[in-house]
């Protein structure tokens, strides 16, 4: 049972990384970031259920990660708004001012 | 219940420096809210005083024994305290740089100070964090504030682009780090404190397994992004070019100090069984950083981009001390870090001053600056030469000690690469200095012509110039007083059991 859930976590992690690399929209990239954090949460809660049923430190870490991911998403969306005001689009590939 | 009260009395002094900063933060917020103060310089004064106060508290605490407080979540030993002093020192030097910049660009001052102080607090907690939750939360406290700071000029499209890249890459790196932490948690059988994780890895006999190697790789990738080690450096030049320059100056030193402290503590405590693996991984990335950072810096045309690559190569030099892995290695790393703070912040201060007066940061536009402002030219040249490592300046002594320690432990290849790339770095630093000084065809660029010199009398200095002068004096003369600094460090670190592992 443990390895199935761990592979689910690894699968979600890979989807998140893949989505971050390929997605062309800022909002979609933020959603992929959330996906990676959720993969971490799945891992933590699984481990906590199997090894650490007394203190449940994994669940506590998961709560912290959820809160921080929310803060990060809030900052990300604020940046999306600022970008949209300046350029009228949120596509990542249109940002090519800064390069070599 | 009584026991907890007693313990909480003990806790107060361990995080007293951070508490001073938090108190200052709250008082700035409240003062700005209730009093309609027109002269915002009061806030700079408050924050500078509180940072100085926290440095003094930390220096006085250096004599105390190492303690682990907050039920094992926070460790205060001398190694951490030195790094916490360095981070507070960076903020002290960076705040004067930002005063004039913010006044010229007409941004909000209070929010800038609050973000900067919060980033400082996050970095200071990160240096002393002793379990995975505290490490993650304080790391995010540092990086979330860095995102906000680097997107501070929100009307500027370049700043928008920089913060977008920084947020996506920083978020990815911290999630990768958290994934590595989750594996550590599982492999150690449900432990969170660093020392208990190491014990747990032994008791579950997982310390040499594939899983712990995987966790090690994930953690190196996550911290490598923060430190901008070479395979993970792609974001650095873009973020440095787009962000406001005082913010770049802060990021280029503070995040590196915090990241290095985290790297040293985490790997020495949690992975003492895999020293060969993490040493070789870090050695490869150090070599790549030195070579690629210095080679690419030659071709750059923007000053900030050039400094970004130069900072990538400097983190490679700092890694030499970490890879050396013994007491001398860590001491040399700390000494070089101290010199690096002054050299790098001095260079950035000169660039901020030039950028404010002319509005450009292209290397080409610096030509013939000596005709207009000899003192600025002189200080920029000295800081750059010190970064490159020219003999009488402090950067030379720092590098020499670093290479000597590595040579003694037998890392000949690393030292050879370091020496070779230092020569390359001297080439591109000298190219800028040549551009600054030579006036062969007697024509200066329009930017330099529009440069207006303030009177350099002793009374009417602006804050950037004060900061420049401190940094230049430190980066010239600190090298001469290197022996006392090393002695102080060795005496203080000697009491500490951690680096002797």
From Swiss-Prot, chain A:
Write out the GO biological process terms. ATP synthesis coupled electron transport; photosynthesis, light reaction
* One Gene Ontology MF term: oxidoreductase activity, acting on NAD(P)H, quinone or similar compound as acceptor
Q: Name one Pfam family in it.
A: Oxidored_q2
Keyword annotations of the record: Chloroplast, Membrane, NAD, NADP, Plastid, Plastoquinone, Quinone, Thylakoid, Translocase, Transmembrane, Transmembrane helix, Transport
Q: Which GO terms describe its cellular component?
A: chloroplast thylakoid membrane; NADH dehydrogenase complex
Q: Where are the transmembrane segments?
A: 1-21, 29-49, 60-80
Quote the catalytic activity from the record: a plastoquinone + NADH + (n+1) H(+)(in) = a plastoquinol + NAD(+) + n H(+)(out); a plastoquinone + NADPH + (n+1) H(+)(in) = a plastoquinol + NADP(+) + n H(+)(out)
Where in or outside the cell it occurs: the entry states: Plastid, Chloroplast thylakoid membrane
Q: What is its main location?
A: plastid
What membrane topology was assigned to this protein in its record? Multi-pass membrane protein
Superkingdom is Eukaryota
EC number from the UniProt entry: 7.1.1.-
Q: Gene3D superfamilies under this entry? A: 1.10.287.3510
Q: Which InterPro entries match?
A: NADH_UbQ_OxRdtase_chain4L/K, NUOK/Mnh_C1-like
Which family would the database say this protein is a member of? Belongs to the complex I subunit 4L family.
Q: What PANTHER family does this protein map onto?
A: NADH-UBIQUINONE OXIDOREDUCTASE CHAIN 4L, NADH-UBIQUINONE OXIDOREDUCTASE SUBUNIT ND4L
Q: What role is this protein assigned?
A: NDH shuttles electrons from NAD(P)H:plastoquinone, via FMN and iron-sulfur (Fe-S) centers, to quinones in the photosynthetic chain and possibly in a chloroplast respiratory chain. The immediate electron acceptor for the enzyme in this species is believed to be plastoquinone. Couples the redox reaction to proton translocation, and thus conserves the redox energy in a proton gradient.
Subunit description = NDH is composed of at least 16 different subunits, 5 of which are encoded in the nucleus.
Record's protein name = NAD(P)H-quinone oxidoreductase subunit 4L, chloroplastic
Source organism per UniProt: Physcomitrium patens (Spreading-leaved earth moss)
Name of the gene = ndhE
Curated annotation (Swiss-Prot), chain B:
> Which compartments does it reside in?
Plastid, Chloroplast thylakoid membrane
KW Translocase (keyword) present:
yes
Q: Name one GO cellular component term.
A: chloroplast thylakoid membrane
Main localization category:
plastid
Question: Does the keyword Transmembrane helix belong to this entry?
Answer: yes
- The UniProt record lists the EC number as 7.1.1.-
Q: Which residues cross the membrane?
A: 15-35, 42-62, 82-102, 107-127, 132-152, 167-187, 210-230, 244-264, 278-298, 307-327, 334-354, 378-398, 410-430, 466-486
GO biological process terms on file: ATP synthesis coupled electron transport; photosynthesis, light reaction
Q: Which UniProt keywords apply?
A: Chloroplast, Membrane, NAD, NADP, Plastid, Plastoquinone, Quinone, Thylakoid, Translocase, Transmembrane, Transmembrane helix, Transport
State the membrane topology: Multi-pass membrane protein
A GO molecular-function descriptor: NADH dehydrogenase (ubiquinone) activity
| Reaction catalyzed | a plastoquinone + NADH + (n+1) H(+)(in) = a plastoquinol + NAD(+) + n H(+)(out); a plastoquinone + NADPH + (n+1) H(+)(in) = a plastoquinol + NADP(+) + n H(+)(out)
What Pfam families does this protein's entry cite? Answer: Ndh2_N, Proton_antipo_M
The record's listing under InterPro entries reads: NADH-Q_OxRdtase_suN/2 (IPR010096), ND/Mrp_TM (IPR001750), Ndh2_N (IPR045693)
PANTHER family (UniProt xref): NADH DEHYDROGENASE (PTHR22773)
Biological role: NDH shuttles electrons from NAD(P)H:plastoquinone, via FMN and iron-sulfur (Fe-S) centers, to quinones in the photosynthetic chain and possibly in a chloroplast respiratory chain. The immediate electron acceptor for the enzyme in this species is believed to be plastoquinone. Couples the redox reaction to proton translocation, and thus conserves the redox energy in a proton gradient.
Assembly behavior: NDH is composed of at least 16 different subunits, 5 of which are encoded in the nucleus.
Family, as annotated:
Belongs to the complex I subunit 2 family.
Q: Which HAMAP family match?
A: NDH1_NuoN_1 (MF_00445)
Q: What is this protein called?
A: NAD(P)H-quinone oxidoreductase subunit 2, chloroplastic
Organism source for this protein? Physcomitrium patens
**Record lineage:** Eukaryota, Viridiplantae, Streptophyta, Embryophyta, Bryophyta
Q: Which gene encodes it?
A: ndhB
């Amino acid at each position: 049972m443990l390895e199935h859930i761990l592979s689910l976590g690894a699968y979600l992690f890979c989807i998140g990384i893949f989505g971050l690399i390929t997605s062309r929209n800022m909002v979609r990239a933020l959603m992929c970031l959330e996906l990676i954090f959720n993969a971490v949460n799945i891992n933590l809660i699984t481990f906590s259920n199997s090894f650490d049923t007394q203190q449940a430190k994994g669940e506590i870490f998961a709560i912290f990660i959820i809160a921080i991911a929310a803060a990060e998403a809030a900052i990300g969306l604020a940046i999306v708004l600022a970008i949209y005001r300046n350029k009228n689009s949120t596509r990542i590939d249109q940002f090519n001012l800064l390069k070599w | 219940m009584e026991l907890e009260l007693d313990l909480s009395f003990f806790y107060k002094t361990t995080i007293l420096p951070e508490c001073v900063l938090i108190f200052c933060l709250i008082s700035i917020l409240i003062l700005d809210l209730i009093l309609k103060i027109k002269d915002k310089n009061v806030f700079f004064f408050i924050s500078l005083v509180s940072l100085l106060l926290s440095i003094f508290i930390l220096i006085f605490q250096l004599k105390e024994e190492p303690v682990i407080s907050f039920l094992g979540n926070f460790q205060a030993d001398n190694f951490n305290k030195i790094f916490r002093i360095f981070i507070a020192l960076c903020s002290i030097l960076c705040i004067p740089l930002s005063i004039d910049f913010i006044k010229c660009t007409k941004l909000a001052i209070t929010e800038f100070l609050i973000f900067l102080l919060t980033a400082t607090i996050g970095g200071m907690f990160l240096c002393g964090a002793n379990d995975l939750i505290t490490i993650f939360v304080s790391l995010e406290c540092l990086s979330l504030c860095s995102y906000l700071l680097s997107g501070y000029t929100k009307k500027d499209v370049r700043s928008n682009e920089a913060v977008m890249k920084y947020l996506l890459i920083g978020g990815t790196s911290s999630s990768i780090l958290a994934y590595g932490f989750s594996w550590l948690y599982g492999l150690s059988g449900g432990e969170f404190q660093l020392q208990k994780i190491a014990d747990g890895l032994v008791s579950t006999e997982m310390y040499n397994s594939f899983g712990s190697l995987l966790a090690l790789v994930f953690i190196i990738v996550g911290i490598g992004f923060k430190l901008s080690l070479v395979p993970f450096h792609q974001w650095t030049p873009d973020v440095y070019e787009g962000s406001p320059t005082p913010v770049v100056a802060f990021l280029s030193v503070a995040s590196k100090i915090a990241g290095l402290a985290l790297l040293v503590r985490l790997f020495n405590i949690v992975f003492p069984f895999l020293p060969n693996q993490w040493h070789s991984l870090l050695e490869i990335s150090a070599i790549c950083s030195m070579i690629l950072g210095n080679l690419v810096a030659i071709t750059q045309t923007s000053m900030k981009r050039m400094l970004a690559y130069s900072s990538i190569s400097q983190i490679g030099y700092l890694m030499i001390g970490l890879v050396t892995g013994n007491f001398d290695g860590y001491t040399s790393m700390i000494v070089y870090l101290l010199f690096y703070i002054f050299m790098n912040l001095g260079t950035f201060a000169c660039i901020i001053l030039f950028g404010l007066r002319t509005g450009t940061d292209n290397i080409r536009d610096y030509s013939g600056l000596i005709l207009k402002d000899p003192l600025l030219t002189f200080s920029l040249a000295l800081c750059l030469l010190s970064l490159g490592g020219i003999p009488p300046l402090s950067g030379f002594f720092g590098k020499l000690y670093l290479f000597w320690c590595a040579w003694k432990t037998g890392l000949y290849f690393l030292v050879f690469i370091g020496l070779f790339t230092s020569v390359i770095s001297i080439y591109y630093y000298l190219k800028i200095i040549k551009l600054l000084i030579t006036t062969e065809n007697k024509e200066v660029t329009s930017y330099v012509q529009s440069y207006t010199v303030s009177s350099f009398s002793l009374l009417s200095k602006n804050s950037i110039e004060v900061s420049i002068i401190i940094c230049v004096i430190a980066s010239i003369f600190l090298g001469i007083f290197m022996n006392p600094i090393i002695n102080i460090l060795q005496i203080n670190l000697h009491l500490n059991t951690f680096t002797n592992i």
